[in-house]
Amino acid sequence: MELLQGKTFVVMGVANQRSIAWGIARSLHNAGAKLIFTYAGERLERNVRELADTLEGQESLVLPCDVTNDEELTACFETIKQEVGTIHGVAHCIAFANRDDLKGEFVDTSRDGFLLAQNISAFSLTAVAREAKKVMTEGGNILTLTYLGGERVVKNYNVMGVAKASLEASVKYLANDLGQHGIRVNAISAGPIRTLSAKGVGDFNSILREIEERAPLRRTTTQEEVGDTAVFLFSDLARGVTGENIHVDSGYHILG
């Protein structure tokens, strides 16, 4: 069943085929959606274009969008308005922190490192939502990705955990602001997946092993599981869901 037939979504944050953003894109494509991709910097452009070309039947718009640059962000959504008109949602899959700030103790986080992580990983959702609102004239859903480290202390997550906590709070406030426009805002808290970002988290293999040994489902999370949950949140099946943080982590978050 093509739950998203005739709808258009922007997917932000694809880096390579292991990206959670790419898993979301594939699931949206399989559900009948039309996709627009953004990339940050020329280094990622080729990857994004090559991946977009693998989606059969899609002629995806691929646009530059550095979320730390207000002018480029505005220009991106203005181009979307000119080329497409209306969109029905955004998958915000963007986060970054300096690797050095993911080591050692959080108390030693640098001021610049803290602000960088907050700017890219948390504030960017608000900046994106402000621009997306202008082209989401039929309502829809804005989705972001978070992790358990935003709710509790996870070793080696440090400054990113604090940024994710900020992101999760932003989801609630944005949901309150944008609900009157028919726009829902939600987050998926995905379990650990081997992505480019995960390489920066120390002892990542140990985290995966613990999930496999202790999570109720006794397995790690897949791109497809996150992507299919995104389809639900973007579809009318979730029309009454906003301000939520849905865990897709084999149940690991319920453990004490």
From Swiss-Prot:
Q: Does the keyword NAD apply?
A: yes
Annotated site (Involved in acyl-ACP binding): 205
- Active site per the UniProt annotation: 147, 157
Keyword annotations for this protein? Fatty acid biosynthesis, Fatty acid metabolism, Lipid biosynthesis, Lipid metabolism, NAD, NADP, Nucleotide-binding, Oxidoreductase
Positions contributing to NAD(+) binding:
13, 19-20, 66-67, 94, 164, 193-197
CDD domains, from UniProt?
ENR_SDR
Q: Which reaction does it catalyse?
A: a 2,3-saturated acyl-[ACP] + NAD(+) = a (2E)-enoyl-[ACP] + NADH + H(+)
**Annotated positions binding substrate:** 97
Cellular component GO terms, alphabetical:
catalytic complex
One biological process term from GO is: fatty acid elongation
Top-rank EC class of the record's enzyme: oxidoreductase
What is a GO molecular function of this protein?
Answer: enoyl-[acyl-carrier-protein] reductase (NADPH) activity
EC annotation? Answer: 1.3.1.9
What InterPro entries does UniProt report for this protein, alphabetically?
Answer: Enoyl-ACP_Rdtase_NADH, NAD(P)-bd_dom_sf, SDR_fam
Pfam families assigned to the protein according to its UniProt record, in alphabetical order: adh_short_C2
Pathway stated in the Swiss-Prot or TrEMBL entry:
Lipid metabolism; fatty acid biosynthesis
| PANTHER family in the cross-refs | ENOYL-[ACYL-CARRIER-PROTEIN] REDUCTASE (PTHR43159), ENOYL-[ACYL-CARRIER-PROTEIN] REDUCTASE [NADH], CHLOROPLASTIC (PTHR43159:SF2)
Please state which protein family the record places this protein in: Belongs to the short-chain dehydrogenases/reductases (SDR) family. FabI subfamily.
**What assembly does the database describe for this protein?**
Homotetramer.
Q: Which NCBIfam families match?
A: PRK08594.1
This molecule's function is given as:
Catalyzes the reduction of a carbon-carbon double bond in an enoyl moiety that is covalently linked to an acyl carrier protein (ACP). Involved in the elongation cycle of fatty acid which are used in the lipid metabolism.
Official protein name in the record: Enoyl-[acyl-carrier-protein] reductase [NADH] FabI
Q: Which gene encodes it?
A: fabI
